[in-house]
């Protein structure tokens, strides 16, 4: 895999001005983004998140998942901390693409859960890969991470690439009546680390 750095610009947001660093995977043509806020020493553990693209949740305000809520909360947490990063990876639908994601949603509307829907379409439950994060983190001078995630696969992916995960920071937000079953499936079948308190908290309903 060859990841080329392209350019950096400012990105004003409701939580402050981030820097947006663009990267291109020369093998797939996919474009990935690193958002950074503040400055740091490479030897310090930096608050960050690996976030896979979710058009429906991030841009269209879908309540079927927790992705948009997690992205906004991660950006707010980083701004409040004064420093941090988000790697925004173009891996829509856990790696199956937007149109296949819509096909999977159609199956879910008929009763399948998120894992069953992927498998009925001939995909694994999670098709994402994380090889691209190593050169992206190298460019933004991150070697140790306080990782905002509920997903153990992301923790392992970083560790396998030699990146120190100094701390896992839970990101349990966005539960509502439309996504509660989806979140439970992620917990029971994909191993996402979510507390019972998250499922018992009715504030998002």
Curated annotation (Swiss-Prot):
The yes or no answer to whether the keyword Amino-acid biosynthesis is present is: no
Name the coenzymes or cofactors required: Zn(2+)
Q: One GO BP annotation here?
A: riboflavin biosynthetic process
Q: How is the cofactor bound?
A: Binds 1 zinc ion per subunit.
For this protein, the Enzyme Commission number is 3.5.4.25
Entry binding sites for GTP: 49-53, 70, 92-94, 114, 149, 154
**Entry's CDD domains?**
GTP_cyclohydro2
Segments traversing the membrane: none
- Whether Cell wall biogenesis/degradation counts among this entry's keywords is no
What pathway is this protein a component of? Cofactor biosynthesis; riboflavin biosynthesis; 5-amino-6-(D-ribitylamino)uracil from GTP: step 1/4
Q: Name one GO cellular component term.
A: cytosol
- What InterPro entries does UniProt report for this protein, alphabetically? GTP_cyclohydro_II, RibA, RibA-like_sf
Which residues are Zn(2+)-binding? 54, 65, 67
**Active site (record annotation):** 126, 128
Keyword tags? GTP-binding, Hydrolase, Metal-binding, Nucleotide-binding, Riboflavin biosynthesis, Zinc
One annotated GO molecular function is: GTP cyclohydrolase II activity
- Catalytic activity, as annotated: GTP + 4 H2O = 2,5-diamino-6-hydroxy-4-(5-phosphoribosylamino)-pyrimidine + formate + 2 phosphate + 3 H(+)
Q: Which NCBIfam families match?
A: PRK00393.1, ribA
**Recorded family membership:** Belongs to the GTP cyclohydrolase II family.
Q: What does this protein do?
A: Catalyzes the conversion of GTP to 2,5-diamino-6-ribosylamino-4(3H)-pyrimidinone 5'-phosphate (DARP), formate and pyrophosphate.
What's the protein here called?
GTP cyclohydrolase-2
What gene name is given for the protein in this entry? ribA
